[in-house]
Regions:
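Residue-level detector of Asp-centered blade-edge/turn motifs that repeat once per structural unit
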Residues: 36-38, 45-46, 84-86, 94, ...
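Beta-rich catalytic cores
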Residues: 30, 37-38, 67, 78, ...
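Conserved core positions of repeat-based scaffolds
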Residues: 36, 40-43, 51, 88-91, ...
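Acidic surface patches and DE-rich sequence motifs
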Residues: 44-45, 55, 93, 149, ...
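Short glycine/serine- and acidic-residue-enriched loop/turn motifs that recur at repeat junctions
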Residues: 53-70, 101-125, 158-182, 212-237, ...
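Bacterial N-terminal signal peptides that target proteins for export
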Residues: 1-10
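Surface loop/turn motifs at the tips and blade-to-blade linkers of beta-strand repeat domains
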Residues: 73-76, 129-131, 186-188, 237-239, ...
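Bacterial Sec-dependent N-terminal signal peptides
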Residues: 14-32
């Protein structure tokens, strides 16, 4: 049975992920931390970290393995939350120490401990993140990681090729461009309560619910996908609205207000109907739903309503919308109910895959290459062996 984790509201916020997102609400089954990466997933169950899916870069934390369809136990300290990137995984212990494992090609593990070659730089067991920092939340992008310290200061590490670390100081040379191999402070005097990261951008919420983003697709009136920003820039909220939660996808970001209204901006999954398919400012998600949380990854987004039903929107290339039809030209521009009738307490987004913690205390996944599952699926598939 899936059981509990929740050291605080803000700590539980980090559990979702990509990849992973620190602003989702804590699950109804406290204690189950869940994160989805590129083609792998991890969960904390009763203080034990278990991972499954692709492990070719050490992201399962048990060495290098092509794939493990059955969850395996990671030799990690007791963790209370998880996030995951394309090929790396990170978690926090109860004291706020951060540990990461998997690919370190671009410094996304943030460690000074010895690493291996898989054959590229990686860590097949958890490594302590450098800097003697204590974090309340983490968020993972594709090849970078960010965290908020106990006082709300933002730090990031990993790839910085388009400003996703929020600093001009990350100028080390990594596989895919400039980077920082250890945590560096984001160039801002603001403090934050939540953070979310994607491929080339990162966003955070301050205590008032205002969104600040850096990197790519910032949600301002400028064409930010042409001119990336290397410092946080406030996202323009229509009508002065503030968000209670925010989640970054591949080229878009979505947020939900305290009243349950969802807004998105960027390219692809903005959920505004047939048009527009992109917006440089936040636009309301159509369909008339009141969401308690939203989750974005890749080209899609999903939201949960009060009864735990999941609705998704965007392209359905691999079944990530959770319904038929599936295909490279199929897209759902309005929130569409995920099939199967499951009710979820929380979701974890990752690339073209979604997993969720159900109200029946199971984990189910749908979309591309279901971690530990049969392949692509447009219907949620329960993960066995948890």
């Amino acid at each position: 049975m899936l059981r509990a984790l929740a050291r605080s509201t803000s700590a539980a916020l980090v559990l979702f992920a990509a990849c992973s997102d620190s602003t989702a609400p804590s699950p109804a089954q406290p204690g189950v931390a869940l994160a989805v990466g590129g083609l792998h997933a991890c969960a904390v169950i009763e203080t034990h970290t278990r991972c499954w899916g692709r492990g070719s870069r050490g992201q399962l934390g048990i060495g290098v393995t092509p794939e493990d369809s059955t969850p395996v136990t990671v030799a990690a300290p007791p963790l209370v939350s998880l996030v995951a990137g394309t090929a790396h995984t990170c978690g926090l212990d109860a004291e706020g120490n951060a540990y990461c494992w998997g690919s370190n090609e671009d410094g996304q593990l943030g460690t000074t401990e010895p690493i291996e070659a898989c054959p590229l730089p990686c860590a097949t067991t958890p490594k302590l993140v450098a800097g003697n920092l204590r974090f309340q939340v983490l968020a993972s992008g594709t090849e970078h990681t960010c965290g908020l310290t106990m006082d709300g200061s933002a730090y990031c590490w990993g790839l910085n090729d388009i400003g996703q670390l929020g600093t001009t100081a990350a100028n080390e040379s990594c596989t895919d461009g400039r980077c920082s191999r250890v945590p560096v402070p984001v160039q801002t005097t603001r403090t934050f309560r939540a953070v979310t990261a994607a491929i080339h951008h990162t966003c955070a919420l301050d205590v008032a619910g205002l969104a600040f983003c850096w990197g790519f697709q910032l949600g301002t009136r400028e064409k930010i996908h042409i001119h990336p920003e290397f410092q946080p820039e406030v996202t323009a909220m229509p009508g002065g609205l503030a968000f209670q939660q925010i989640s970054a996808g591949g080229r878009h970001t979505c947020g939900v207000t305290g009243a349950g209204a969802a807004y998105c901006w960027g390219i692809d999954a903005i959920g505004a109907g047939p048009t527009p398919l992109e917006s440089d400012l936040p636009v309301p998600v159509a369909g008339g739903h009141s969401f308690r949380s939203v989750y974005s990854a890749g080209l899609t987004s999903c939201g949960l309503v009060d009864d735990g039903s999941a609705y998704c929107w965007g392209p359905n290339s691999y079944g990530e919308i959770g319904t038929e039809p599936v295909g490279s030209t199929v897209r759902f521009n309005l929130p569409t109910a995920v099939s199967g009738g499951l009710r979820f307490s929380a979701l974890a987004p990752g690339g073209s895959t979604y997993c969720g913690i159900t109200t029946a205390a199971t984990i189910a996944c749908w979309g591309r290459g279901i971690p530990g599952g049969p392949s692509d699926s447009s219907v949620p598939v329960t993960v066995p062996g948890l």
